[in-house]
Each structure stands twice: as structure tokens, then as C-alpha cells.
Amino acid sequence: MFVLVMICLFCQYWGVLNELEEEDRGLLCYKCKKYHLGLCYGIMTSCVPNHRQTCAAENFYILTKKGQSMYHYSRLSCMTNCEDINFLSFERRTELICCKHSNYCNLPMGL
């Protein structure tokens, strides 16, 4: 009878215990200074975001004379106080994409 009660108590909290274990493991992000079309020009490593950090992908574009954006390269990292935003200057555009929904979510897709 005691074993049955213990099993019932443990089963009640099974989902909560699993969620805590996943949080303890932490999020993993790619880290690369220059990433272009599936290759890291340098060393591809991982980083674990600290407090108030998320995975980040900074995509750099060159602006053509016609005003169109042409993809140049990306920088992958863990970034503090990251927010999705676009920066535009006369010669280039920088797109900052932040994520924390899954491990290695900062890998650019379709570039």
C-alpha cells in the first residue's frame, strides 16, 4: 500500500520534474564570428546564454546602387538584452534576430 501511494505521488509531479531538468540543462547557441551559406569561417563553438541573454544571429547585407539588400554574412552569438531589429545605413543593412525557443535556434535558414 505504501509503495502504491508513493508511486501516485511521484506520478503527479512527473511533468514538473521533467520541466525543471530541462531548464537546468540550459539553452545552447551557435557562436561564430563569420558564418556564410552553411560554413563558419573560423571556429564554430557553442555558448550558453547567461542571465538576460538569448541566442542571436546578426545578418549583414550590402545595399546595391538600386537599393536592394544582398546577403553578405552572419555573426552567431549569445547576446544580452537582445531584441529583433533592423539597422539601415547608406551602405549596409544589419538584421538582428533573437531566439530562445530551442537549442541552436540562431542558425540562419535560407541564407
UniProtKB/Swiss-Prot annotation:
Belongs to the PATE family. One of its GO terms (cellular component) is extracellular space. This is Prostate and testis expressed protein 2. Residues 1-18 form the signal peptide. The keyword Disulfide bond applies. Keywords: Disulfide bond, Secreted, Signal. InterPro entries: LY6_UPA_recep-like, PATE2. Residues 27-108 form the UPAR/Ly6 domain. PANTHER family: PROSTATE AND TESTIS EXPRESSED PROTEIN 2 (PTHR47884:SF1). Disulfide bonds join C29-C55, C32-C40, C47-C78, C82-C99. Expressed in prostate, testis, brain and lung. It is found in: Secreted.
